[in-house]
């Protein structure tokens, strides 16, 4: 029967302690209160005892009756003084050691800072040199570009000058052409008049006369060809004479224009064949032929062409010039002869007389023409000479301009270089000044070191940056230290209060008992004075002035806490659009009420042990095992259908191998969701007090009935894990097989910053040897080279009862009959009794192959207990190199995380029992940091080391991946939970949860719960604003989150990430939410039901989060999910798919945030109120049962 949660109406003021979320190893332990007296005090007491005995014999008891209490008080004060001195000496040694460590760390940080600054200076110098080189290159490129621009400008100017010269030459050519045409017309008119005067006969006779030479005859071909029949008018004659004159006067054309204009002019005035006879054309073109320019000459530059023209003009010798001039004159004479006007020196004597009258007129015109031709030749020669001189002057001007521009650019470049050099000189002078200033500062450094930082005049930016970084680091450390100090000082106050009460209540002490034999029972010790002295001495030893009066401090804190809970209660009552149901604050969304967890029980762990502090728990797995005959004991989990298990075999059934394959595939498909259904409702809860651990066994279906309690060890247990019995087909390990897993480290290359990969992944075999039998008879094993580790103690007690000596035997309280006895098993549910009955006939020798429970302790031991037989009897005890922090079971292997940075892997032998030959040790990191937690993810083991997650292959024992889950190195990964294809992580002292992909290790989502809790519970002084996650659980596709302030949150998973994370509907108030950062996306088409386990990514949306009003006063220690029994009226033989899942949370104290602690009456005579004790809260959730057919 489940226990219903009844509201508690009576409240009382209580002192709540803030338990630190992280175990600090190596802390100081509590002093032993029941120690023996010091030797000196004992010697003095013996001497005084003898003296008092002598006085009693002489004077009787009345003589020493008043003296003896004074003597006893003096001796007690002396003993306390010795005790105080010893404690102060020990404390002084610890402070010295801490001081040395801090000094060493400071020196190391100082050296690292100097190295960093030196590297920074070197890098800065390198960059400055590179910048200077680049500046030089840029300057050279700029100078080259300026020279090229100058050359382009000069070429443009030269082209423009050539164009202007070309225009001038064209104008000159037009003027000369016009003048030549005028002369030609005058000459033609003269020829016509001469022919008219002479007559045709004389003209023909003159044509037939022989010429003096052939050259003159050829040159006169034009005049001879022009007869009356061929010349049809003045225009034809003008055209013929223009062609002759143009052809004969080639030298004149060369002086006037360049080659291009010569070609153009020749083509424009060339006569057609019909106008000139063939013989005349040949005569005109044969003596003087213009040479066509070659392509090479055409491609030459204008300047080169001008030089060639000048050379051609100047290279003509005087003989050629005379020939040309003679040709002109001869041509004129031939023209006269062709018209019948022969000069006088060439005429015969008989013709002289006849022509005297006509010679006078013609000779006058000829002389005028000859004078004009000579004048024209002289002018052309002078023009050519002037052109040559002009071209030379232009070339000289161009050269001088170019030289001037080049010199100007060089001057500019030198000026720029001078400016650069001046700047460098200025920089060097500034550097020299800076160096001088630094030198002066170095000389005065000794004096400035004595001056505080705030009093110094100079405060540079680097110093400010360093101070800010140091301040932030110190602030983070201060927050952690304040939390630890709060816990430590609270326990000190409670211890002092209890010591004072114990001293006041005691009737006899150690020294008083020593002297009690001298007097009768009527004499009582002065307890009040002794207690006052003890209290005062303890008060002086306490550093904090706040805890000198613990009663006053307790009352003040209780009053503050009541006021704070009152504020929380008022904030919770506000209407914010949310729904309250079953003690939960639900979002106003369309959700089924059946999905809300229903609280069914809330109770202290043990009523008769109010000082116990709950720590961890596990659900016992009643499956697997092997008996003495080698037969397998198979216990089917609850997720197999009972109806399918009762089916009889038929001839048509499939082969057993196919059924087994299908069963394995179905199990692998939803492995993470089926793990929570493998255990039973039998729960082992670990609690501790005064450094001793106690195990409480209960059934989650009926938690009010504690089945059995027994002490586990004299140390604090840090973890517990239920392990199933050996299963058929699980691998075994022998000495030969163990060697194949041995390997060295350094194989993983891509490592996060700050993680040393030298020994990462190194696996070695550690042999075990059996130690000498202990007093309790438990077989104890340790490694061959085991060395005694440094003593690590921590006081986990807040008990007001005086601590018991650890060497004294533990007195067990009367307990109910154990479950393994016939009387105790009747209290168990029927399904647990049936499961345990299968192991009744197995002897104790085979208990290692049966279901067991493994526990890891702070005292570096692993304890193995049987889960089905004698629970309190420890089967084996293994000494480890360091404290055991986490234990995970995978098939036939146990993975244990140790505080020295290693993982121990235990195996089964061929008999199915856990091997005592040895175990594998896998190195994860340095021994200064611990492997905090382990989590089974498919076939891998995820281990947390500092801020990193190390993924280990559970079968090959090889590290496959290492990634950083948090950027800060000092932020340790605390909890991990796997479901589907995602793993949720929580970070120590951080309110943000992180989701990673289980196979690709991709960061998928961040969820910050701090804004959500602040919105729900307000910003009071209960540290709700500084939220940290202390417990995580994934059950039935729901994430349970426990915080350091006792707040419990449950968030249903969604198979796909919703696009709209925050509700922004204006018609209704927005639901509470927090920071939700998404790094991945899933398909929107697939639904949750269609997804397989490997495809299901457990995204969270705080808009659907549910907050429980039932919580703990301190941090939530653990969550545990176990299957519940069938509901009343259900037929267990029927195949059902809806079963109960019980979610259990454990923590210090209980609080209902809707009520708080107001108006609770004080409980006099009790040191701990009921609501301050460790509590268990159990919820019931209707879960869909993943039934698989066998």
Curated annotation (Swiss-Prot):
Keywords: Coiled coil, Cytoplasm
Tissue: Expressed in neurons of the ventral cord, retrovesicular and preanal ganglia and nerve ring, intestinal cells, seam and hypodermal cells, body wall, head muscle and pharynx.
UniProt keyword annotation of Coiled coil present: yes
Coiled-coil intervals, chain numbering: 78-165, 383-491
UniProt domain RH2: residue ranges: 456-542
A cellular component annotation (GO) from this entry: axon
GO molecular function: JUN kinase binding; kinase binding; kinesin binding; MAP-kinase scaffold activity; signaling receptor complex adaptor activity
The UniProt record lists the keyword Coiled coil: yes
Ranges annotated as biased composition (Polar residues): 277-292
InterPro entries according to UniProt: JIP3/JIP4 (IPR039911), JIP_LZII (IPR032486), Quinoprotein_ADH-like_sf (IPR011047), RH1 (IPR034743), RH2 (IPR034744), WD40/YVTN_repeat-like_dom_sf (IPR015943)
GO biological process: defecation; egg-laying behavior; locomotion; regulation of JNK cascade; sleep; synaptic vesicle transport; vesicle-mediated transport
Subcellular location: Cytoplasm, Perinuclear region
Start and end residues of each stretch annotated as Disordered: 1-35, 263-364, 775-829
Pfam families hit by this protein: JIP_LZII, RH1, WD40_2
Annotated ranges, domain RH1: 24-112
Family: Belongs to the JIP scaffold family.
Record's function text: The JNK-interacting protein (JIP) group of scaffold proteins selectively mediates JNK signaling by aggregating specific components of the MAPK cascade to form a functional JNK signaling module. May function as a regulator of synaptic vesicle transport, through interactions with the JNK-signaling components and motor proteins. Binds specific components of the JNK signaling pathway namely jnk-1, jkk-1 and sek-1. Associates with components of the motor protein, kinesin-1. Pre-assembled unc-16 scaffolding complexes are then transported as a cargo of kinesin, to the required subcellular location.
Protein name: JNK-interacting protein
């Amino acid at each position: 029967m489940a226990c219903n949660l009844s509201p508690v109406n009576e409240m009382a003021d209580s002192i709540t302690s803030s338990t630190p979320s992280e175990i600090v190893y190596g802390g100081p332990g509590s002093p032993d209160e029941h120690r023996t007296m010091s030797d000196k005090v004992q010697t003095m007491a013996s001497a005084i005892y003898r003296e008092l005995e002598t006085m009693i014999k002489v004077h009787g008891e009345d003589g020493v009756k008043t003296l003896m209490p004074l003597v006893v008080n003096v001796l007690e004060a002396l003993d306390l003084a010795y005790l105080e001195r010893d404690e102060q000496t020990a404390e002084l040694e610890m402070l010295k050691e801490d001081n040395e460590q801090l000094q060493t760390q400071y020196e190391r940080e100082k050296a690292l800072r100097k190295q960093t600054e030196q590297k920074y200076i070197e890098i800065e110098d390198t960059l400055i040199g590179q910048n200077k080189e680049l500046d030089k290159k840029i300057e050279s490129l700029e100078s080259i570009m300026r020279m090229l621009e100058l050359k382009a400008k000069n070429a443009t100017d030269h082209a423009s000058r050539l164009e202007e010269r070309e225009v001038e030459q064209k104008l000159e050519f037009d003027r000369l052409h016009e003048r030549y045409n005028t002369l030609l017309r005058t000459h033609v008119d003269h020829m016509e008049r001469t022919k008219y005067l002479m007559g045709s006969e004389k003209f023909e006779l003159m044509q037939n006369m022989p010429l003096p030479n052939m050259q003159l005859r050829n040159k006169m071909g034009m005049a001879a060809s022009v007869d009356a029949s061929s010349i049809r008018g003045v225009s034809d004659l003008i055209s013929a004479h223009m062609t002759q004159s143009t052809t004969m006067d080639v030298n004149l054309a060369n002086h006037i224009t360049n080659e291009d204009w010569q070609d153009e002019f020749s083509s424009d005035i060339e006569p057609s064949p019909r106008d000139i006879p063939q013989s005349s054309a040949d005569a005109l073109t044969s003596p003087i032929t213009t040479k066509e320019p070659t392509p090479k000459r055409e491609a030459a530059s204008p300047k080169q062409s001008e030089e060639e023209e000048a050379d051609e003009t100047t290279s003509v010798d005087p003989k050629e010039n005379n020939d040309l001039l003679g040709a002109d004159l001869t041509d004129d004479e031939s023209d006269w002869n062709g018209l019948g006007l022969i000069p006088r020196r060439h005429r015969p004597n008989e013709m002289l007389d006849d022509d005297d009258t006509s010679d006078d007129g013609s000779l006058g015109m000829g002389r005028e023409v000859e004078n004009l031709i000579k004048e024209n030749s002289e002018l052309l020669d002078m023009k050519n000479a002037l052109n040559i001189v002009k071209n030379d002057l232009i070339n000289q001007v161009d050269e001088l301009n170019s030289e001037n521009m080049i010199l100007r650019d060089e001057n500019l470049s030198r000026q720029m270089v001078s400016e650069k050099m001046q700047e460098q000189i200025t920089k060097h002078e500034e550097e020299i000044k800076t160096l001088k200033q630094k030198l002066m500062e170095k000389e005065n450094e000794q004096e400035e070191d004595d001056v505080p930082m705030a009093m110094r005049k100079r405060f540079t930016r680097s110093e400010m940056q360093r101070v800010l970084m140091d301040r932030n680091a110190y602030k983070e450390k201060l927050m952690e230290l304040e939390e630890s100090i709060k816990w430590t000082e609270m326990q000190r106050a409670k211890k002092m209060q209890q010591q004072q009460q114990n001293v006041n209540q005691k009737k006899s002490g150690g020294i008083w008992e020593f002297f009690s034999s001298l007097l009768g029972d009527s004499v009582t010790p002065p307890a009040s004075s002794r207690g006052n002295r003890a209290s005062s001495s303890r008060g002086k030893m306490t550093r904090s002035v706040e805890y000198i009066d613990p009663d006053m401090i307790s009352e003040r804190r209780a009053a503050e806490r009541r006021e704070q809970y009152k504020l929380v209660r008022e904030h919770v009552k506000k209407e914010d659009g949310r729904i309250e149901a079953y003690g939960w604050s639900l979002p106003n969304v369309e959700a089924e009420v059946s999905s809300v967890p229903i609280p069914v029980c809330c109770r202290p762990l043990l009523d008769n042990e109010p000082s116990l502090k709950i720590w961890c728990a596990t659900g016992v797995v009643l499956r697997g095992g092997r008996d003495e005959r080698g037969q397998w004991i198979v216990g089917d989990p609850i997720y197999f259908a009972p109806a399918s298990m009762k089916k009889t075999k038929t001839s048509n059934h499939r082969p057993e191998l196919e059924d087994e394959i299908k069963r394995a595939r179905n199990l692998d498909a939803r492995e993470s969701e089926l793990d929570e259904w493998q255990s039973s409702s039998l729960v082992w809860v670990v609690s501790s007090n005064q450094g001793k651990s106690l195990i409480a066994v209960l059934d989650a279906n009926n938690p009010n009935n504690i089945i059995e309690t027994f002490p586990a060890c004299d140390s604090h247990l840090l973890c517990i894990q239920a392990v199933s019995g050996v299963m058929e087909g699980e691998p075994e390990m022998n000495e030969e097989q163990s060697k194949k897993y041995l390997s060295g480290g350094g194989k993983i290359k891509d490592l996060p910053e700050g993680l040393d990969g030298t020994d990462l992944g190194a696996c070695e075999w550690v042999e075990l040897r059996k130690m000498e039998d202990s007093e309790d008879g438990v077989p104890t094993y340790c490694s061959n080279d085991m060395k005694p580790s440094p003593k690590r103690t921590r006081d986990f007690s807040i008990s007001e009862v005086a601590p018991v000596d650890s060497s004294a035997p533990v007195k067990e309280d009367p307990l109910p009959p154990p479950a393994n006895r016939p009387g105790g098993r009747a209290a168990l549910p029927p399904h647990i009794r049936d499961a345990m009955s299968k192991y009744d006939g197995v002897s104790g020798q085979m208990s290692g192959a049966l279901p067991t429970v493994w526990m890891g302790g702070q005292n570096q031991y692993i304890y193995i207990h049987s889960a089905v037989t004698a629970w309190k009897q420890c089967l084996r005890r293994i000494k480890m190199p360091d404290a055991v922090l986490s234990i995970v079971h995978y098939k036939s292997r146990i993975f244990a995380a140790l505080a020295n940075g290693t993982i121990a892997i235990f195996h089964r032998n061929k008999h199915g029992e856990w091997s005592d030959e040895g175990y594998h040790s896998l190195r994860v990191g340095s021994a200064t940091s611990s492997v905090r937690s382990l989590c089974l993810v498919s076939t891998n083991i995820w281990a947390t080391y500092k801020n990193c997650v190390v993924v280990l292959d559970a079968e090959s024992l090889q590290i496959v991946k290492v990634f950083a889950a948090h950027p800060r190195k000092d932020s340790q990964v605390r909890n991990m939970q796997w479901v589907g294809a995602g793993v949720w992580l929580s970070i120590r002292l951080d309110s943000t949860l992180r989701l990673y992909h289980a196979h690709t290790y991709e960061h998928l989502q961040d969820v910050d719960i701090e804004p959500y809790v602040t919105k729900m519970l307000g910003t009071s002084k209960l540290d709700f604003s500084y939220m940290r996650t202390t417990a995580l659980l994934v059950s039935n596709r729901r994430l349970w989150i426990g915080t350091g302030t006792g707040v419990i949150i449950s968030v249903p998973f969604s198979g796909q990430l919703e696009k709209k994370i925050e509700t922004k509907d204006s018609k209704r108030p927005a639901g509470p939410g927090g920071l939700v950062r998404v790094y991945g996306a899933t398909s929107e088409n697939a639904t949750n039901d269609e997804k397989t386990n490997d495809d299901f990514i457990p995204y969270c949306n705080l808009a659907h989060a549910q907050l429980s009003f039932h919580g703990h006063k301190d941090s939530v220690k653990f969550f545990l999910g176990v299957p519940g029994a069938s509901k009343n009226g259900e037929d267990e033989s029927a195949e059902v798919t809806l079963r109960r899942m019980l979610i259990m949370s454990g923590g210090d104290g209980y609080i209902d945030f809707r009520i708080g602690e107001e108006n609770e009456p004080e409980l006099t005579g009790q040191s701990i109120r009921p609501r301050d004790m460790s509590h268990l809260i159990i919820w019931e959730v209707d879960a869909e049962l993943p039934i698989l057919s066998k």
